[in-house]
C-alpha cells in the first residue's frame, strides 16, 4: 500500500483498454494519404480472397472467410456467417466488429444482405442477423 506522499508524487494510472477491432478505429485521408482517427461502427471493403479455414482444437468444420481490403487501406480477415454465400474476389462488402472464437485472427464479421452480399436463402428464424427478407404468406 503506497503512502499518501508517494501518491502525491506519482498518482495512480488508469488502465488503458485496447480496442478489439482496431481497423474500425481508423479513417483514411486520400489527399494526404494518411490514416486519421475516425471511428466507425462498420466499414466498406473489397474482397481480395475468399476461402475456408479449419477451426481450433475441439471443433471440426470448414469455416468460410474473406480477406477484405477496407476503405482505409487496412486488410483484415472477416467471417462469412450463415449457410452458403455469393461472395467472390472483388465483391464489395460491409464489415462489422465481432470475433470468431474458434478461428485464429478473425476479428470481424461480414454483414449479410448489405452491398454485394446476399442474405441467407430459406432462413425463417433470426432473419435480421442474416439479411433475409420476410417470406410471402401463402393464402
UniProtKB/Swiss-Prot annotation:
<comment type="subunit">
    <text>Part of the 30S ribosomal subunit. Contacts proteins S8 and S17. May interact with IF1 in the 30S initiation complex.</text>
</comment>
<keyword id="KW-0820">tRNA-binding</keyword>
<dbReference type="InterPro" id="IPR005679">
    <property type="entry name" value="Ribosomal_uS12_bac"/>
</dbReference>
<comment type="function">
    <text>With S4 and S5 plays an important role in translational accuracy.</text>
</comment>
<dbReference type="GO" id="GO:0019843">
    <property type="term" value="F:rRNA binding"/>
</dbReference>
<keyword id="KW-0689">Ribosomal protein</keyword>
<feature type="compositionally biased region" description="Polar residues">
    <location>
        <begin position="19"/>
        <end position="39"/>
    </location>
</feature>
<keyword id="KW-0699">rRNA-binding</keyword>
<keyword id="KW-0488">Methylation</keyword>
<feature type="compositionally biased region" description="Basic residues">
    <location>
        <begin position="9"/>
        <end position="18"/>
    </location>
</feature>
<dbReference type="Pfam" id="PF00164">
    <property type="entry name" value="Ribosom_S12_S23"/>
</dbReference>
<dbReference type="InterPro" id="IPR012340">
    <property type="entry name" value="NA-bd_OB-fold"/>
</dbReference>
<keyword id="KW-0687">Ribonucleoprotein</keyword>
<dbReference type="GO" id="GO:0000049">
    <property type="term" value="F:tRNA binding"/>
</dbReference>
<comment type="function">
    <text>Interacts with and stabilizes bases of the 16S rRNA that are involved in tRNA selection in the A site and with the mRNA backbone. Located at the interface of the 30S and 50S subunits, it traverses the body of the 30S subunit contacting proteins on the other side and probably holding the rRNA structure together. The combined cluster of proteins S8, S12 and S17 appears to hold together the shoulder and platform of the 30S subunit.</text>
</comment>
<dbReference type="GO" id="GO:0006412">
    <property type="term" value="P:translation"/>
</dbReference>
<protein>
    <recommendedName>
        <fullName>Small ribosomal subunit protein uS12</fullName>
    </recommendedName>
</protein>
<dbReference type="GO" id="GO:0003735">
    <property type="term" value="F:structural constituent of ribosome"/>
</dbReference>
<feature type="modified residue" description="3-methylthioaspartic acid">
    <location>
        <position position="102"/>
    </location>
</feature>
<keyword id="KW-0694">RNA-binding</keyword>
<feature type="region of interest" description="Disordered">
    <location>
        <begin position="1"/>
        <end position="44"/>
    </location>
</feature>
<dbReference type="InterPro" id="IPR006032">
    <property type="entry name" value="Ribosomal_uS12"/>
</dbReference>
<comment type="similarity">
    <text>Belongs to the universal ribosomal protein uS12 family.</text>
</comment>
<dbReference type="GO" id="GO:0015935">
    <property type="term" value="C:small ribosomal subunit"/>
</dbReference>
Amino acid at each position: 500500500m503506497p503512502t499518501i506522499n508517494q501518491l502525491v508524487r506519482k498518482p495512480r494510472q488508469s488502465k488503458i483498454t485496447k480496442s478489439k477491432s482496431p481497423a474500425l478505429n481508423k479513417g483514411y485521408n486520400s489527399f494526404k494519404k494518411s490514416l486519421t482517427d475516425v471511428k466507425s461502427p462498420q466499414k466498406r471493403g473489397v474482397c481480395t480472397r475468399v476461402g475456408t479455414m479449419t477451426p481450433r482444437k475441439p471443433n471440426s468444420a470448414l469455416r468460410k472467410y474473406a480477406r477484405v481490403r477496407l476503405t482505409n487501406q487496412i486488410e483484415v480477415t472477416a467471417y462469412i456467417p450463415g449457410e452458403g454465400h455469393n461472395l467472390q474476389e472483388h465483391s464489395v462488402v460491409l464489415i462489422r466488429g465481432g470475433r470468431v472464437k474458434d478461428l485464429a485472427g478473425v476479428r470481424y464479421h461480414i454483414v449479410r444482405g448489405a452491398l454485394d452480399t446476399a442474405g441467407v436463402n430459406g432462413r425463417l428464424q433470426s432473419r435480421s442477423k442474416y439479411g433475409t427478407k420476410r417470406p410471402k404468406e401463402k393464402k
